[in-house]
Amino acid sequence: QEKNLLPDFTAIENVCIASLAANNNHKIAEQESLKIIQKVGLKDRANHYPSELSGGEMQRIAISRAIVNKPRIILADEPTGSLDHENANQIFNLLFKLKNKDRVIIFATHNRFFANKADYKISLSNGKIKTINGKI
């Protein structure tokens, strides 16, 4: 749920850092970062610092940073918690497209609409499994 963006770096630099850490060259890191930032609807905010972004924009940049290296497994805790309905839809559509590209996405959400789109659903109550839907 925490965004943990680096305050001294722009949005695109925050995303690039993850790509550079994966040993991508700077040009590829920047291209891939910009592609992801565009997919989350923030191309026009790419050169802004976290202090200049709203909470929802920071969340979308943090998601961009998490997926820029195309991880096989994505763990997301309330990935749309700070987002309005339109942006939440955009993020979940992006995550579900990634799922369809042989990736595993595990997410926690209080949003029943998005929870019901999952292939498998586990409901918790007071820290204990309440129901399990789907094959596990």
Which positions does each model-derived feature cover?
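Short coil-to-helix segment of the ABC ATPase nucleotide-binding domain corresponding to the Q-loop/switch region
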Residues: 9-17
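ABC-type ATPase nucleotide-binding domains, specifically the catalytic core motifs of the NBD
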Residues: 16-28, 39
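Conserved ABC ATPase signature
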Residues: 49-53, 57-58
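Hydrophobic anchor residue at the start of the ABC signature
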Residues: 63
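A short, proline-enriched helix->beta-strand linker immediately N-terminal to the Walker B motif
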Residues: 68-72
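Catalytic Walker B motif of ABC-type/P-loop ATPase nucleotide-binding domains
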Residues: 74-77
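Helix N-cap at the start of a conserved alpha-helix in ABC-type nucleotide-binding domains
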Residues: 85-87
